[in-house]
């Protein structure tokens, strides 16, 4: 299954606010069909929220769930930590891109350096003490600067630091799952995939 490129507002109306997909918010509409939601539908919607927010394909999400199952700790929390430490998501959280899709494009077009090395994989897993900055070209700097001007006034994640003089971000530590700005029940996502197996 490929990455979703269709109308974003339809997904937001269906699943609720997804800040990684778009910065628009859904209208407050009462869903009359909510009363008859099955358990399967609830689990599926939680999985779809996660998938569309982070811009993943179904196969990528399955791979992340398998990695999270093998790791120590709660599978749901480890899954969210893995997704939050992706390079495209870190750029979005730092404010260097307005959405995760815009951050993915920055990385794919080779505008981002991690620890002084060019990285063009949006799924690159950042580690604590990684330094993320735009490439030393005017085009890269302008793209990041425009996004940061829109980001002013928003709260920065507690696991990240942003330095404005040469525009660089620092990953302090692994993300705390309580901070994630997405209303999601990660256990339902893990349950969805455990029932599929």
UniProtKB/Swiss-Prot annotation:
It is found in: Plastid. CDD domains: S4 (cd00165). The keyword rRNA-binding applies. PROSITE patterns: RIBOSOMAL_S4, S4. InterPro entries: Ribosomal_uS4, Ribosomal_uS4_bac-type, Ribosomal_uS4_CS, Ribosomal_uS4_N, S4_RNA-bd, S4_RNA-bd_sf. GO terms for biological process: ribosomal small subunit biogenesis; translation. GO terms for molecular function: rRNA binding; structural constituent of ribosome. GO terms for cellular component: plastid; small ribosomal subunit. Keywords: Plastid, Ribonucleoprotein, Ribosomal protein, RNA-binding, rRNA-binding. It comes from the Eukaryota. Its main location: plastid. Pfam families: Ribosomal_S4, S4. The keyword rRNA-binding applies. Residues 85-161 form the S4 RNA-binding domain. SMART domains: Ribosomal_S4, S4. Part of the 30S ribosomal subunit. Contacts protein S5. The interaction surface between S4 and S5 is involved in control of translational fidelity. One of the primary rRNA binding proteins, it binds directly to 16S rRNA where it nucleates assembly of the body of the 30S subunit. Belongs to the universal ribosomal protein uS4 family. This is Small ribosomal subunit protein uS4c.
């Amino acid at each position: 299954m490929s990455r979703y490129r269709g109308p974003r507002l339809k997904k937001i109306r269906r699943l609720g606010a997804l800040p990684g997909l778009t910065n628009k918010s859904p209208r407050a509409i009462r869903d009359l069909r909510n009363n008859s939601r099955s358990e399967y539908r609830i689990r599926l919607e939680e999985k779809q929220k996660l998938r569309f927010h982070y811009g993943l394909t179904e196969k990528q999400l399955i791979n992340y769930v398998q990695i999270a199952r093998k790791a120590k700790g709660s599978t749901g929390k480890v899954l969210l930590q893995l997704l939050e430490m992706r390079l495209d998501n870190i750029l979005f959280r730092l404010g260097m891109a307005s959405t995760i899709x815009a951050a993915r494009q920055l990385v794919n077009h080779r505008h981002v350096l991690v620890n002084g090395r060019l990285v063009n994989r949006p799924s690159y897993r950042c580690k604590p003490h990684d330094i993320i900055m735009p490439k030393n070209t005017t085009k890269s700097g302008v793209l990041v600067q425009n996004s940061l001007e829109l980001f002013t006034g928003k709260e920065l994640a507690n696991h990240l630091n942003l330095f404005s003089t040469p525009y660089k971000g620092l990953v302090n530590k692994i993300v705390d799952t309580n901070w994630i700005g997405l209303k999601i029940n990660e256990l339902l996502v893990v349950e969805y995939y455990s029932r599929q197996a």
